[in-house]
């Protein structure tokens, strides 16, 4: 167990094997509500507040603070218990967070006035790691945006779905941070609402949700565009098959007549029977094609220019 000291408050950072020490830190008045949560170490995204006694409030729970993209079970949970004088965490590991230096965060936390503000700094650093991940997601989205311009294959549609899945994971992680921030505000604020660290954490969470909302809208637009293109291609295939079947109706009908074995077949003695039949097939096929073309049933539903526009040169001052 690591004990970090602030201004009249403490943070006890514990490993998963130190639950017995954490049990001793839970106030006896909070234990009736904490017992079910504490005894079950398999809780995921559990959050409760205890405001029964004034000046002795507490927020406790468990959240997933790291989630892999491949498997649902590939996640890391940390547990926390927060009061006005101290808080403890179980299984919180700075090394999991992207580009976050634990020692610098601890030094920043030690300057906090109370335990609530200290935990808000920790929550803010958690959001910093999430925002870094969201920035990396934006790079992937930008690449996909330009790939769709030149390639509308099935693999692109699959990539859109994969990015939507990744975005949902980031959204859920940020939502967990938002839930804790709201619980702290409900339990201990407004005394910390004007503090800069609380405001910074709140703004980071709002920034994360703004990014997520914008990316969701763009992915939905990309998915809708891909669905329209897929539907159009399906319609083109059905239309082509229909036209193909219609154009070959004359030769099919004539072939069916030739296949009949009636006793009287006058065309057997015609000198130019084959020539006449071929002319009849070609003429009827052309007439049917001209009729379909006149109705506009053979043209593309979406006219595509084969010639690509040359990119405009940027003007330089």
From Swiss-Prot:
<dbReference type="GO" id="GO:0000287">
    <property type="term" value="F:magnesium ion binding"/>
</dbReference>
<dbReference type="GO" id="GO:0050897">
    <property type="term" value="F:cobalt ion binding"/>
</dbReference>
<feature type="site" description="Essential for ion permeation">
    <location>
        <position position="235"/>
    </location>
</feature>
<protein>
    <recommendedName>
        <fullName>Magnesium transport protein CorA</fullName>
    </recommendedName>
</protein>
<keyword id="KW-0813">Transport</keyword>
<keyword id="KW-1003">Cell membrane</keyword>
<comment type="subunit">
    <text>Homopentamer. In the absence of Mg(2+), interactions between subunits are weakened, and dimers, trimers and tetramers can be observed in vitro. Homotetramer.</text>
</comment>
<dbReference type="InterPro" id="IPR045861">
    <property type="entry name" value="CorA_cytoplasmic_dom"/>
</dbReference>
<feature type="transmembrane region" description="Helical">
    <location>
        <begin position="240"/>
        <end position="260"/>
    </location>
</feature>
<comment type="function">
    <text>Mediates influx of magnesium ions. Alternates between open and closed states. Activated by low cytoplasmic Mg(2+) levels. Inactive when cytoplasmic Mg(2+) levels are high.</text>
</comment>
<dbReference type="InterPro" id="IPR002523">
    <property type="entry name" value="MgTranspt_CorA/ZnTranspt_ZntB"/>
</dbReference>
<dbReference type="GO" id="GO:0005886">
    <property type="term" value="C:plasma membrane"/>
</dbReference>
<dbReference type="Pfam" id="PF01544">
    <property type="entry name" value="CorA"/>
</dbReference>
<feature type="transmembrane region" description="Helical">
    <location>
        <begin position="272"/>
        <end position="292"/>
    </location>
</feature>
<dbReference type="GO" id="GO:0015095">
    <property type="term" value="F:magnesium ion transmembrane transporter activity"/>
</dbReference>
<dbReference type="GO" id="GO:0015087">
    <property type="term" value="F:cobalt ion transmembrane transporter activity"/>
</dbReference>
<keyword id="KW-0472">Membrane</keyword>
<feature type="site" description="Important for closing the ion permeation pathway in the closed state">
    <location>
        <position position="241"/>
    </location>
</feature>
<keyword id="KW-0812">Transmembrane</keyword>
<comment type="similarity">
    <text>Belongs to the CorA metal ion transporter (MIT) (TC 1.A.35) family.</text>
</comment>
<dbReference type="InterPro" id="IPR045863">
    <property type="entry name" value="CorA_TM1_TM2"/>
</dbReference>
<feature type="short sequence motif" description="Probable selectivity filter">
    <location>
        <begin position="259"/>
        <end position="261"/>
    </location>
</feature>
<keyword id="KW-0406">Ion transport</keyword>
<keyword id="KW-1133">Transmembrane helix</keyword>
<keyword id="KW-0460">Magnesium</keyword>
